[in-house]
Amino acid sequence: MKRSMYAGRVREEHIGQEITLKGWVGRRRDLGGLIFIDLRDREGIMQLVINPEKVSAEVMATAESLRSEFVIEVTGQVAAREQANDKLPTGAVELNVTALIVLNTAKTTPFEIKDGIEANDDTRLRYRYLDLRRPEMLENLKLRAKVTHSIRNYLDELEFIDVETPFLSKSTPEGARDYLVPSRVNKGHFYALPQSPQITKQLLMNAGFDRYYQIVKCFRDEDLRGDRQPEFTQVDLETSFLTEQEIQDITEGLIARVMKETKGIEVTLPFPRMKYDDAMALYGSDKPDTRFDMLLQDLTEVVKGVDFKVFSEALAVKAIVVKGAADNYSRKDIDKMTEVAKQYGAKGLAWVKVVDGELNGPVAKFLTGIQEELTTALALEDKDLVLFVADTLEVANATLGALRGRIAKELGLIDNDKFNFLWVVDWPMFEWSEEEGRYMSAHHPFTLPQEETAHELEGDLAKVRAIAYDIVLNGYELGGGSLRINQKDLQERMFKALGFSAEEANDQFGFLLEAMDYGFPPHGGLAIGLDRFVMLLAGEENIREVIAFPKNNKATDPMTQAPSTVALKQLEELSLQVEEDETNKTN
């Protein structure tokens, strides 16, 4: 029989109507001779009542056989509940069943189909199709669909053209590791799955599309964490003839639309702007969380004269003040924070507490001569905890930035109902890679340098600034973009600055350089991480919670067992041979 409506949409206006519902058995209760069933579908739960005096013996027997997650079809009359359940949208009504059919049975599930389960992540991913039945997971994916719908409508209104770009593309050496796909037809040659459609979308600007967008899958073979996956989705934009400000205005409008249509929140425009150097100096991060204070303080000059070489001889001494938290952190707690500091390259973590107007702690004796100056500089009050890092400026910033975020979570300083957006602008063009022993692109090698610093491409690369901009939300990089290079000579200079020979640049990017001979317009764009955006809107801490079928932290899928070995014949067709891992060899 045809389904009348979703179970979760039955309301008081349907009282007296005969309807047919289909879904899963959430729970069965036997009470006073009656059987009560919670019928669940994607829209919610509806209570069913099977009364032995009003149904056949066959229907009653079927009802008694029901177990959790059986799939059933029921027909009956909607009635008002004697005692309403205010916790359910359907709580004022119930269905008096007259007919019942079992469409499929189910084994006992490895975890309950409800919110707040304690199953481990791999178990949830192994049975992802069951995990997705849980209401909170279903709501997360429905939110994701609403977000993409809102984005498409907004960009369509602004006359952006949705264009699909290739998944089988060329491997390039910059950025994260590529996922490689061997070519059967062209032996020894490989495609790469795109880390982003960066070059192809730029070529679309050269083709005259003017405004492009795509909600697109991208792939990066990198170490995983809570806000990363090997395959992820981004909202990709590119425009011609627009300024940095105009691109940011479009992006702010997009985010404002999404926030209003999915969360009912009116965001204030324009978003604040913060220079990269200020973000690092004050927050210790290029993606600052501005929902709480605890800014980094530079004490390098203040402590120059103290009789403590760790401070007086350090390139930089910086501190954060944790207001009123002296009693919240024991020496053991601070030892744990010291271990965190070492993970960011710091040699240690110095600290003092303000107790009855005096400084207490391991380094307090070295600071007595500057206590008044220190108290004024840091606006110290009783019960404050001060954490110091003495090292290079980069290490001090990164360490205190990490501790700042950790402490704010521990002390509940963050208002989780806030959505603080901001732009981080005026980025360095290059960043030094210790692993590579050279400067690498901070964003990518197609970013347009600021005109007044472009001459340093042949000089001090640390001084080159980019016309680049990242959009940040609550301490997460939501997206980033830039104006792009459209002049061939400047692009060649950029490649040379990155250490490419002319031959290497032509081998890797010759098609782009050639395109620049044919009237390439000024252009720029941006990409927003859709998974991360939805994660933050949903109040989750891991993007796995807003992706239907994600990978685990080992980049594997416990359900399908991907990645897996393949048949020898498949490898032979690709002219590939797999070397056995030394750790798996037996003597």
From Swiss-Prot:
ATP binds at residues 220-222, 229, 477, 529-532. SUPFAM superfamilies: Class II aaRS and biotin synthetases (SSF55681), GAD domain-like (SSF55261), Nucleic acid-binding proteins (SSF50249). This is Aspartate--tRNA ligase. It holds the Pfam family tRNA_anti-codon. It comes from the Bacteria. GO terms for biological process: aspartyl-tRNA aminoacylation. It is an enzyme of class 6 (ligase). Homodimer. PANTHER family: ASPARTATE--TRNA LIGASE, MITOCHONDRIAL, ASPARTYL/LYSYL-TRNA SYNTHETASE.
